[in-house]
Amino acid sequence: MFTMKKSMLLLFFLGTISLSLCEEERSADEDDGEEEVKRSLFSIFKTAAKFVGKNLLKQAGKAGLETLACKAKNEC
Protein backbone atom coordinates (compact mmCIF):
# COMPACT_ATOMS: atom_id res chain seq x y z
CA MET A 1 0.00 0.00 0.00
CA PHE A 2 2.84 2.35 0.86
CA THR A 3 4.54 1.79 -2.53
CA MET A 4 1.25 2.50 -4.28
CA LYS A 5 0.93 5.81 -2.45
CA LYS A 6 4.51 6.72 -3.40
CA SER A 7 3.91 5.98 -7.07
CA MET A 8 0.61 7.92 -7.04
CA LEU A 9 2.36 10.87 -5.39
CA LEU A 10 5.15 10.69 -7.97
CA LEU A 11 2.65 10.65 -10.85
CA PHE A 12 0.78 13.61 -9.35
CA PHE A 13 4.02 15.54 -8.93
CA LEU A 14 5.20 14.84 -12.50
CA GLY A 15 1.77 15.74 -13.88
CA THR A 16 1.80 19.03 -12.01
CA ILE A 17 5.25 19.90 -13.36
CA SER A 18 4.31 19.06 -16.96
CA LEU A 19 1.10 21.10 -16.66
CA SER A 20 3.09 24.04 -15.33
CA LEU A 21 5.54 23.82 -18.25
CA CYS A 22 2.69 23.67 -20.76
CA GLU A 23 1.09 26.78 -19.27
CA GLU A 24 4.40 28.67 -19.47
CA GLU A 25 4.83 27.73 -23.14
CA ARG A 26 1.24 28.70 -23.90
CA SER A 27 1.67 32.12 -22.28
CA ALA A 28 4.95 32.64 -24.16
CA ASP A 29 3.20 31.79 -27.45
CA GLU A 30 0.40 34.25 -26.68
CA ASP A 31 2.95 37.01 -26.05
CA ASP A 32 4.60 36.32 -29.41
CA GLY A 33 1.23 36.46 -31.15
CA GLU A 34 0.52 39.93 -29.79
CA GLU A 35 3.90 41.13 -31.02
CA GLU A 36 3.21 39.73 -34.49
CA VAL A 37 -0.12 41.56 -34.59
CA LYS A 38 1.61 44.80 -33.63
CA ARG A 39 4.18 44.28 -36.39
CA SER A 40 1.53 43.58 -38.99
CA LEU A 41 -0.50 46.65 -38.00
CA PHE A 42 2.62 48.80 -38.23
CA SER A 43 3.49 47.42 -41.67
CA ILE A 44 -0.07 48.09 -42.91
CA PHE A 45 0.11 51.65 -41.61
CA LYS A 46 3.55 52.11 -43.15
CA THR A 47 2.37 50.84 -46.56
CA ALA A 48 -0.71 53.07 -46.46
CA ALA A 49 1.42 56.11 -45.59
CA LYS A 50 3.75 55.41 -48.52
CA PHE A 51 0.81 55.03 -50.90
CA VAL A 52 -0.84 58.26 -49.75
CA GLY A 53 2.48 60.10 -49.85
CA LYS A 54 3.25 59.01 -53.40
CA ASN A 55 -0.21 59.96 -54.63
CA LEU A 56 -0.05 63.37 -52.97
CA LEU A 57 3.36 64.03 -54.49
CA LYS A 58 2.11 63.03 -57.93
CA GLN A 59 -0.87 65.36 -57.64
CA ALA A 60 1.31 68.19 -56.36
CA GLY A 61 3.78 67.59 -59.18
CA LYS A 62 1.03 67.68 -61.81
CA ALA A 63 -0.43 70.86 -60.35
CA GLY A 64 3.02 72.44 -60.20
CA LEU A 65 3.81 71.55 -63.82
CA GLU A 66 0.45 72.86 -64.99
CA THR A 67 1.04 76.12 -63.14
CA LEU A 68 4.53 76.49 -64.62
CA ALA A 69 3.25 75.78 -68.13
CA CYS A 70 0.44 78.28 -67.63
CA LYS A 71 2.86 80.97 -66.44
CA ALA A 72 5.29 80.23 -69.27
CA LYS A 73 2.54 80.69 -71.87
CA ASN A 74 1.02 83.67 -70.00
CA GLU A 75 -2.40 82.01 -70.10
CA CYS A 76 -3.13 82.29 -66.37
From Swiss-Prot:
Positions annotated as propeptide: 23-37
Tissue and organ expression note: Expressed by the skin glands.
GO CC terms in record: extracellular region
Intracellular or extracellular location(s): Secreted
Disulfide bonds: C70-C76
Signal peptide feature range: 1-22
Top-rank lineage group of the source organism: Eukaryota
Keywords assigned by UniProt, alphabetized: Amphibian defense peptide, Antibiotic, Antimicrobial, Cleavage on pair of basic residues, Cytolysis, Disulfide bond, Fungicide, Hemolysis, Secreted, Signal
Record InterPro entries: Antimicrobial_frog_2 (IPR012521), Frog_antimicrobial_propeptide (IPR004275)
Keyword Secreted: yes
Gene Ontology terms describing biological process: defense response to bacterium; defense response to fungus; killing of cells of another organism
Stated role: Antimicrobial peptide active against a variety of Gram-positive and some Gram-negative bacterial strains. Has antifungal activity against a slime mold isolate. Has hemolytic activity against human erythrocytes.
Name this protein carries in UniProt: Esculentin-2CG1
Organism (species): Amolops chunganensis (Chungan torrent frog)
